[in-house]
UniProtKB/Swiss-Prot annotation:
Homodimer. The RNAP catalytic core consists of 2 alpha, 1 beta, 1 beta' and 1 omega subunit. When a sigma factor is associated with the core the holoenzyme is formed, which can initiate transcription. It comes from Anaeromyxobacter dehalogenans (strain 2CP-C). This is DNA-directed RNA polymerase subunit alpha. NCBIfam families: PRK05182.1-2 (NF003513), PRK05182.2-1 (NF003515), PRK05182.2-5 (NF003519), rpoA (TIGR02027). Residues 250-339 are annotated as: Alpha C-terminal domain (alpha-CTD). One of its GO terms (biological process) is DNA-templated transcription. It comes from the Bacteria.
Amino acid sequence: MVDPIVTKNWRDLIKPRGLVVDQDSLSNTYGKFVAEPLERGFGITLGNSLRRVLLSSLQGAAITSVKVEGVEHEFMTIPEVAEDVTDIILNLKEVLLQIHTNDVKTIRIEADGPKEIKAGDLITDAQVEVLNPGHHILTISEGGRVRAEMTARRGRGYVPAERNKVPGSPIGTIPIDALFSPIRKVNYQVTNARVGQQTDYDKLTLEVWTDGSVAPADAVAFAAKIVKEQLSIFINFDEAEEPAEEIKPVEEQKLNENLFRSVDELELSVRSANCLQNANIKTIGDLVQKTEAEMLKTKNFGRKSLKEIKEILAEMGLSLGMKLENWPPKAAPQGAPKV
């Protein structure tokens, strides 16, 4: 056990009051986060570390190969198709996917002209979600016909086409460069923060742009977790935990009366309502104890459903990931809606 005097090396350092999220600009592809105050120099240390991990280490999904009927290599053309194979491959690289499994998935195009094929026309299964369905892929003229099969999987960072070659693949299979990272851009800025009369502390402002397959707040959390896990091997001691603050007993806390309402009263879309029913979530109290990650594991539950539920809960002063001890209570508070 480490000497309590030594623990002052880290316990006496200034820590941020919390992570502030700019709600006015927050979207499913952009987030602005502020952490302050930090000890001088920690703004650059944390900002640079998070930026590098965000750009290099988060997993995403991408198409890794394509095989088009009648095409042997990428420099050929397809009869009655406006784009040549090279252009089609470039368009396929920009298809944004979310894959809810670690398995390699097969995606198909089966179409006859005249028709414009967009990302939303790709034939997938329930585990593959296309995030930019309006993205153009190719155009088939009258009398044209396209039959194509693609593979897609989850991965990390950038993987060149050469590494996406699979031994034994059918002749005509064309490997594709894959950019798996869901992060499009990361900026950070370090300015001065005030603590009392001192202004020589750091304020870290972090901006994150994603492709929509991961929420910016989740991306930052995942990156921080990666950094924490990597650094943990350098700690060669155990320490006594700091005395816990006295917590007000749950019985004395006034519960939000909305917690006792049925989820049927939320006026959700049919898809979202069915997902909650299949997950056996009956009350709002049951719902708020679920984390975003747990909800996204629910069958057919996607980002749109998540956003819908979060917005409705926010109007009630509630959120996902809440901790409700001894739920459900033996008796609902007076005046609470009956389920």
